[in-house]
Amino acid sequence: MYGLGLLPTLIIPSESVQLGVPEVNKIGAALIAALVLVPPVQAQSVKDQLAAFIDANADQYAEVAQHIWDLAEVGYMETESSETLQGVLRDAGFEIASGVAGMPTAFVATYGGGGPIIGIMGEYDALPGINQSRSSERDPVPGKIAGHACGHHLFGTGSVAAALAVRDWLEDSGTPGTIRVYGTPAEEGGAGKVYMVRDGLMDDVDVMLHWHASSANSASASSSLANKSGKFRFYGQSSHAAGAPWRGRSALDAVEAFHYMINMMREHVTPAARIHYVITSGGSAPNVVPDFAESYIYVRHPDPEESRRMFDWVTRIAEAAAMGTETRMEHEVIHGIYNVLPNEALARAMFDNLTIVGGVEYSAEERRFAEAIHSTFPADAPSIERAAMIEPFEVIEVGQGGSTDVGDVSWTVPTAGLGTATWVPGTSAHSWQAVAAGGTSIGNKGMINAAKTLAFTLYDLFTTPSLIDAAYEEFERRRGPGYVYEPLLGDRDPPLDYRASVVGGGNN
């Protein structure tokens, strides 16, 4: 197996999870103190200068990312992860607004003045139930109940790295404009970005950029699935299941009837629709008629209005299930997110810059680690050589696969993103292999490539007004005339306790 040997010496060891917030803030101060400033005379162009700045500080960025990897804090509980990123930005001269939109771990960091205003988003929440060491073999860490299986420790840090490089250039060049970093919590089911959009925190932004951990390098104009989710709670009457079942009313029967009718519904929705559920509570003993049961439902579709309609249908099914079992039903909308609105003009600019940056080149040790991880995949998995390649540019109008709260942002401001090979090619998101690679120098290298691509694209936007104009014209055309944004999740408050069962955030 290959593990910690891949880590740069500056990466904080796993003991960093014991640090309190004051110690975490020291990381930000130490990073700023250690930043290597690259004189403009050493660069052949501004983009060379931006790349040199990021390369010169790559070890410090890896330190921050791996500290957040160690913390592995779940949605709306990312206290130390958020504080770490805020500390880095604050010490670099950004003005910080913390706890925005009713979310204690959300923040907006601003540097500069005037227009254009370019935003860049960062995430930092981990996933419960998927923890793993920095090993190429399956190796859960005892006592750790979450892991960065979607690479958000890299996402947040890479976005900050890009912002710091561009901040340095803005200051040196005197270029007008504002860069804004949005710290967006709880992407994994908590829809943190939606509350920022709903509160108008992005209304004055000209363009928004983002990126994501991936097993390939790509920057395309692509969409995603809209998604509305909810918890459906059924209340019955307990009784002895053998002695007097007629006196009871089974909440579990209601859930089963609910799911049965949903499965009948599947025949009558379009092929692009996706409906999935889990029973989060179904009773505790077979000899007791359950008086409470709960089902957690996701409803997805490429069209947000169709997702909304299907969720309403599911709600009526739940009402019918309660009626048929003489139980009572309540439901709570947990989150609702739009599909991503593609923007080809921005995506092509991002793609051009990704092509300049290039793919991820493995060292001999990294290659051995990648081969060991790759051996756990099916025979038809993509070759590990794919990490060094750039995927062809595509325009994907109809969403496929997953969902993201970037969708709501993209319907509010022209938005584009990219993915870089932070994982071994063939890796699925939300897997132990993603956690493992993201904790090594492979993940760090992909993050640095993303930071450079974002920084280059930020430079293009600050210096090319016609690019912003083209992006906005496409944005308006795709939204259609008279468009008014209405959040799928309605007026509910952020579900700050939606991971409450995950005691203590990242570790227990």
Predicted feature locations:
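Sec-dependent signal peptide recognition
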Residues: 5, 25-31
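Short, Lys/Arg-enriched N-terminal segments with co-localized hydrophobic residues
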Residues: 6-23
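Bacterial N-terminal signal peptides
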Residues: 30-38
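Sec/Tat signal peptide C-region and signal peptidase I cleavage site
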Residues: 39-43
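Metal-dependent amide/peptide-bond hydrolase catalytic core
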Residues: 44, 256-508
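Acidic/His- and Gly-rich active-site-bordering loop/insert found
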Residues: 44-148, 153, 157-178
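Sec/Tat-exported extracytoplasmic proteins
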Residues: 54-61, 65, 69-72, 76, ...
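Histidine/acidic-residue-rich, glycine-tolerant segments that coordinate divalent metal ions
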Residues: 139-147, 153-154, 170-290, 300
